[in-house]
Amino acid sequence: HVDHGKTTLTAAITTVLAKKYGGSARAFDQIDNAPEEKARGITINTSHVEYDTSLRHYAHVDCPGHADYIKNMITGAAQMDGAILVVAATDGPMPQTREHILLGRQVGVPYIVVFLNKCDMVDDEELLELVEMEVRDLLTQYDFPGDKTPIIRGSALKALEGDCIWESKIIDLANILDTYIPEPKRSIDQPFLLPIEDVFSISGRGTVVTGRVERGIIKVGEEVEIVGIKPTSKTICTGVEMFRKLLDEGRAGENVGVLLRGTKRDDIERGQVLSKPGTITPHIKFESEVYVLSKEEGGRHTPFFKGYRPQFYFRTTDVTGYVELPEGIEMVMPGDNVKMVVTLIHPIAMSDGLRFAIREGGRTV
């Protein structure tokens, strides 16, 4: 919530941890005057800081404004591994607190740790316990484990001022992050997936698809599935090439050509994916959380209504889709965020948390 102390906490974490583990402290005003980012045309004020504990290196995002938070959570390219929910002990949970938790659930934030801030200003132990209970209830309402969620009582401002009692609470918070939020699975360890960008046939060799390996590893001789747009089919990878060199495998992050056995050039198209069999499925209908660009951000100048039929851009391709809005919502204004159900005209390989863009006549909506 605005003024509950997110930015002060961010400054306190960098300052206290820099003192203990090395690294650079960031002052409040350096974080608060976050530069505007123009990520994919969306204007978001965000501040990126990094800090170290004895076990890990963290990348941490702080947004000054509520609207910035929403935009960042919905459109942020990187999936968050966890979040720190800051609640002022003096106010307790506010309407925006609920919205942040709900959004965390919808965009797939897997773990939340709570920092109960401004505890130096509350003398009443019972009041602190009441606020904790309220926060736990809210988390439980949105399917987070409210009873098990760690809650650290602290004072970001006092910690920033160097008061050692409150500094120790920041160290506690860091230890909780280290232990409560599990090590994320690196993309190389996840099942193989390659969004197809191009397809061509090489006479005498067969069909080659090219693209950047999104995750996992593909080895020569392995079976793969071709998923999306058309019925799912299976084939064997008979070769991997990079920069015209033949390789034994292609790894996450590499741009490769994959040679496929007995597959015709016309059987495959851009927009499909190559994947480890059984790991991703094609879907026509999905629920989504969408941020609609404002006019100033280059978005629409007018609202849209249910039945709107724009293009949905997934990975490498546009697909036309039909929009249904939640009950009681007649129209969506530029600058709004909304939950919508979309039905595509043909299936696309998707999994929970997949990002996409909505476009109309070549411009992003």
Swiss-Prot record:
Matching Pfam families: GTP_EFTU, GTP_EFTU_D2, GTP_EFTU_D3
Alphabetically ordered keywords of this record: Cytoplasm, Elongation factor, GTP-binding, Hydrolase, Magnesium, Metal-binding, Nucleotide-binding, Protein biosynthesis
Main location: cytoplasm
EC numbers: 3.6.5.3
Broadest EC class assigned to this enzyme: hydrolase
Domain of life, source organism: Bacteria
Compartments reported by the entry: Cytoplasm
Binding positions for GTP per the UniProt entry: 1-7, 62-66, 117-120
One GO location term (cellular component): cytosol
Reactions catalysed according to its record: GTP + H2O = GDP + phosphate + H(+)
Record carries keyword GTP-binding: yes
Single GO term (MF): translation elongation factor activity
Classification via CDD domains: EF_Tu, EFTU_II, EFTU_III
Domain tr-type G span(s) in chain numbering: 1-185
InterPro entries in the record: EF-Tu_GTP-bd (IPR041709), EF-Tu_GTPase (IPR050055), EFTu-like_2 (IPR004161), EFTU_2 (IPR033720), G_TR_CS (IPR031157), P-loop_NTPase (IPR027417), T_Tr_GTP-bd_dom (IPR000795), Transl_B-barrel_sf (IPR009000)
Residues at which Mg(2+) binds: T7
NCBIfam families for this protein: EF-Tu, PRK00049.1, PRK12735.1, PRK12736.1
Family: Belongs to the TRAFAC class translation factor GTPase superfamily. Classic translation factor GTPase family. EF-Tu/EF-1A subfamily.
Binding partners and assembly: Monomer.
Role noted for this protein: GTP hydrolase that promotes the GTP-dependent binding of aminoacyl-tRNA to the A-site of ribosomes during protein biosynthesis.
HAMAP family from the UniProt entry: EF_Tu_B (MF_00118_B)
Identification of the protein by name: Elongation factor Tu
Organism whose genome encodes this protein: Buchnera aphidicola subsp. Melaphis rhois
